[in-house]
Amino acid sequence: MASELDGLPVIATRREEAEGFLQGLVSKSLGWARKYSLFTYPFVTACCGMEYMTMASARYDSDRFGAAMPRFSPRQADLLMVVGTVNCKQAPILQRIYEQMADPKWVMAFGVCASSGGFYDNYATVQGIDRIIPVDVYVPGCPPRPEQVLDGIMLLQKKIQNQSHKLIDRKPLPVIAGGPGR
Amino acid sequence: MSEAKGVGGIDPRATPGSAGAGERPPMGTVSRAGDGELYAPMPSKHMVINLGPSHPAMHGVTRAVVELNGEIIEEMKLDIGFLHRGFEKSCENVTWGQVFPYTDRLNYVSSIMNNVGFALAVEKLAKLEIPERARYLRVITSEIHRICDHLTLVGAMAMELGAMTVFLYGIEARDLLWDRLAELCGARLTSNYARIGGVARDMPEGWQEKTLKVLDRVVAIREEIGQLLNRNRIFIDRCLNTGKVSREDALELGFTGPCLRASGEPYDIRKAAPYLVYDRLDFDIPVGSNGDNFDRYLMRMEEMRQSDKIIRQCFEQMAPGEIIVQDFRYALPPKPLVYGTIEGVMAHFKLVMEGIKVPAGEVYSYTEAANGELGFYVVSDGGGRPYKLGLRAPGWPMLAALPVMTKGSLLSDLIPTFDSINMIGGEVEQ
């Protein structure tokens, strides 16, 4: 039910306006910095790993995006690339890796197995990693061509630029229900 | 090795005492810092560490629980199953033709070899004779994929020992071959090419010339990789005399393929039980003498050379002709027949909806894949789907032998050993 207060204009003080403007500037510049300094943790399990190798090599060279420099420690990475099939035995490990990564962090599902389980519609395979961790970009294909992955990286960069970033984020950290160690 | 290549060559300009100067380290002993008389032991404690599964050197799907005394491996246990995707069970739920995509993803570095292995198993059961040209095309694509597989192994092995350049060169060469495969069958990696009774399609116009040019380029890159690694002090120090398996042990453990031949047993299914057209081709089987990681690396380099030779011979020998059997109980009829005749429509419909009817019976068929013997045990009840399908994965015995191979060696020797056996998750875990 609409109240009569609803129609009233929202009053913002000049101080709040200024703060919002500054926060916007900070957010934009942080977003710009973060989108060009993605450090990848490649969680490589299966066939897609071969395409990942190609994508990281000379011909496609994912490094030229200022992105996707592989880091083999989750604590040094902010982009988790889940490359290949994740099965039920692997799922808790993936979840642990995601939790160990420092905030802010993003996840890319590389290939149909990571995105949806692919054609492995059976008892062993997790039907998409978004059942256990949040995913920002899905790259289809079995396996995807390197161009598709580069497209995914650019999409993610756009997404990162448009997110709101803060210098100090006082929000409580998101908690994954039922994760290991809880 | 069959040719005197590699560390054997003596270079007068090489640093005295290095492998290039012709002075090999003494064979048969694991050289350690502790062996000399100046050995000053540091107090070390017993500890158990956990390597993987999410560790770059364990390829993401293997967990090794290593019991260490200082840096020496005392005991190791392997934990696998992190890529179990239910291969055998999935195959029993689909028609014979639909099994091919699953076989592609077994050893995903050389998918056509798995395709061919499965197609040969079904053809053995159905007693199908496939056309000449299809045989040659199967051999050509298999050998291209063998080169891809070995390039990937050499690249990855070198990278994990610190040589990034080799990896970049290897991937570049593999990409060139993948481009040709993509022209042939539409996919870069999971190239679905073999069909029951033949192959999916013929070579496109000008493909042969292009492939020959690419092979020349791959030869150049391979030689360059050889120059970077064969006399590389770091590479030799980490590979020579590490992960040794004797000929007897290798046979006992069930090794096949390059790992068995590196230990000195000249067994290759392409020679021992020739299939397709391998009996008409002239190629050598390289054999190692030491059975260590360096021999396994040299084996891969030499096999690439032989595969190259095989492909060139096939191009010379093959003649135009049919590429798939003209029996519509097994192969899809050509599209004009499907659209124009009722028999064509019916054959197409039956094949797509029910699958081919393979006569009841059981068969074991084996081929020489990039890692060794790839065996399919197929049981048919006469229906459109496999009743049971069993796989003998070539990588499995080598992986199972890893605790034996690394016992008593340094923890750092585990990395080249694990690399040189070429463990591929897809086929080991099934």
Swiss-Prot record, chain A:
Pfam families: Oxidored_q6 (PF01058). Its EC number is 7.1.1.-. GO terms for cellular component: plasma membrane; respiratory chain complex I. It is found in: Cell inner membrane. It catalyses: a quinone + NADH + 5 H(+)(in) = a quinol + NAD(+) + 4 H(+)(out). The keyword Transmembrane does not apply. Its main location: membrane. Transmembrane segments: none annotated. It is a peripheral membrane protein. GO terms for molecular function: 4 iron, 4 sulfur cluster binding; iron ion binding; NADH dehydrogenase (ubiquinone) activity; NADH:ubiquinone reductase (non-electrogenic) activity; quinone binding. Binds 1 [4Fe-4S] cluster. [4Fe-4S] cluster binds at residues 47-48, 113, 142. Its cofactor is [4Fe-4S] cluster. Keywords: 4Fe-4S, Cell inner membrane, Cell membrane, Iron, Iron-sulfur, Membrane, Metal-binding, NAD, Quinone, Translocase, Transport, Ubiquinone. It comes from the Bacteria. InterPro entries: NADH_UbQ_OxRdtase-like_20kDa (IPR006137), NADH_UQ_OxRdtase_20Kd_su (IPR006138). GO terms for biological process: aerobic respiration; electron transport coupled proton transport. NDH-1 is composed of 14 different subunits. Subunits NuoB, C, D, E, F, and G constitute the peripheral sector of the complex. NDH-1 shuttles electrons from NADH, via FMN and iron-sulfur (Fe-S) centers, to quinones in the respiratory chain. Couples the redox reaction to proton translocation (for every two electrons transferred, four hydrogen ions are translocated across the cytoplasmic membrane), and thus conserves the redox energy in a proton gradient. PANTHER family: NADH DEHYDROGENASE, NADH DEHYDROGENASE [UBIQUINONE] IRON-SULFUR PROTEIN 7, MITOCHONDRIAL. Belongs to the complex I 20 kDa subunit family. This is NADH-quinone oxidoreductase subunit B 1. It comes from Anaeromyxobacter dehalogenans (strain 2CP-C).
From Swiss-Prot, chain B:
One of its GO terms (molecular function) is quinone binding. GO terms for cellular component: plasma membrane. SUPFAM superfamilies: HydB/Nqo4-like. The keyword Isomerase does not apply. Its EC number is 7.1.1.-. It is found in: Cell inner membrane. It catalyses: a quinone + NADH + 5 H(+)(in) = a quinol + NAD(+) + 4 H(+)(out). Keywords: Cell inner membrane, Cell membrane, Membrane, NAD, Quinone, Translocase, Transport, Ubiquinone. It is a peripheral membrane protein. It is an enzyme of class 7 (translocase). Residues 1-36 are annotated as: Disordered. InterPro entries: NADH_Q_OxRdtase_suD, NDH1_su_D/H, NiFe-Hase_large. The keyword Translocase applies. NDH-1 is composed of 14 different subunits. Subunits NuoB, C, D, E, F, and G constitute the peripheral sector of the complex. Belongs to the complex I 49 kDa subunit family. NDH-1 shuttles electrons from NADH, via FMN and iron-sulfur (Fe-S) centers, to quinones in the respiratory chain. The immediate electron acceptor for the enzyme in this species is believed to be ubiquinone. Couples the redox reaction to proton translocation (for every two electrons transferred, four hydrogen ions are translocated across the cytoplasmic membrane), and thus conserves the redox energy in a proton gradient. NCBIfam families: NuoD (TIGR01962), PRK06075.1 (NF004739). This is NADH-quinone oxidoreductase subunit D 1. It comes from Anaeromyxobacter dehalogenans (strain 2CP-C). The lineage of its organism: Bacteria, Pseudomonadati, Myxococcota, Myxococcia, Myxococcales.
